[in-house]
Amino acid sequence: MTFIKEFRNKGYFHQCTNLDRLTSITKETKIAAYIGFDCTATSLHIGSLMQIMILRLLQQHGHKPIVIIGGGTSKIGDPTWKDEARKILSKEEIAKNAEGIKKSLSKFIKFGEESSDAIMLDNSEWLDSLNYLDFLRDFGSYFSVNRMLTMDSVRLRLEREQHLSFLEFNYMLLQAYDFYYLSKYYNCSLQLGGSDQWGNIVIGVDLIRKISSKEVFGMTTPLLTTSSGAKMGKTAAGAVWLNEDLLSPYDYYQYWRNCEDADVIRFAKLFSELNTKEFTKFENLVAEDINAAKKQLAYELTKLCHSEQAAKSALETAVKIFEQGEIDENLHTVVLELEILQAGINAYELFHEAGLATSKSEARKLIRGKGAKINDKLIEDENMIINTNFLLDKSVIKLSAGKKRHILVRI
């Protein structure tokens, strides 16, 4: 199967500047392609996982992945498409974050000196020495403001009469220059990114075409959300990091184990390397099999990110907590902010918050009547303080009201 065919089959494709030509070229020869990552944390999280799997797919097909971290652009902060500009990072913070990002990526792709080995570059290498007057003289005439004003990210802001800063325009130019630089010095012919990057990518493609007449391409992926519309990468308890110093392999396993039923097949295609036979099995699932599929998905993705031993350990821990400990993972779940447990909460208040009592007085009555349990142990005192010490494997608390009503409290 060709790179482009597998790219589309797995659900990665959204747009391409010239798909037919790119398909032909990637069949005939090996190319270099790049993806850029924010340099704002010491680890990537699962919001970047589709892009990482694309780099892995590139490498598996013999193409060369180039990873760009925005050390240069991080020094001026991200463009303000959001309500609040991101913190401007120091050189030391950027270097530390870059090291962590490479650790995340090294779980999935190989860095080295071979033709298809990945390389990581920091755009500060060329942007720091870029003279503004020279840049305007050498490149300014190639950028069309008319064209830039038609980009969705700009057009929508103007239509809404929202502030549009000069920095945002400059950021587009710097990203275009990144592509030009990589094309010239690293023979990079493809830029990949999320669909929100389409305008910036096209500007880079146009710049290279006008200056050097080189044939380069841009291709984007769909923005990824869960089936309920939630953004990938974060939960109520925080980001789902790829590096184990920020999130344990068990918690990583549990994130995928608890994904929505409607997402299992899609996530398996996007993020796993299960074969066609396994996909077919997933697609023909009946309701009672969905939990087995979730376990397999969680196992495969944990193995890919951490190791097979880490996946086995996570599975064993889950069995110990939820099966041998008679806690069913499929119980109704409520989410509680970690800060509340860290401060401590009265037992009767927790039962009320969790929905096991319609009022605090009813919760008190439940406890006094010996009908309330926490982690299958009877609660004797309605004022008992529940805190993080009650968390099972740092993630859940089981509450029971009587014999038939049970809830899992997750942080």
Curated annotation (Swiss-Prot):
Entry GO CC: cytosol
Name of the top EC class for this enzyme: ligase
InterPro entries: aa-tRNA-synth_Ic, Rossmann-like_a/b/a_fold, S4_RNA-bd_sf, Tyr-tRNA-ligase, Tyr-tRNA-ligase_bac-type, Tyr-tRNA-ligase_bac_1
Record's function text: Catalyzes the attachment of tyrosine to tRNA(Tyr) in a two-step reaction: tyrosine is first activated by ATP to form Tyr-AMP and then transferred to the acceptor end of tRNA(Tyr).
Coiled coil start-end: none
Pfam families: tRNA-synt_1b (PF00579)
Binding site for L-tyrosine: 34, 171, 175
Binding site for ATP: 234
Main location: cytoplasm
Assembly and oligomerization: Homodimer.
Enzyme Commission number(s) from the entry: 6.1.1.1
Entry keywords, A to Z: Aminoacyl-tRNA synthetase, ATP-binding, Cytoplasm, Ligase, Nucleotide-binding, Protein biosynthesis, RNA-binding
HAMAP family in UniProt: Tyr_tRNA_synth_type1
Domain of life: Bacteria
Protein name: Tyrosine--tRNA ligase
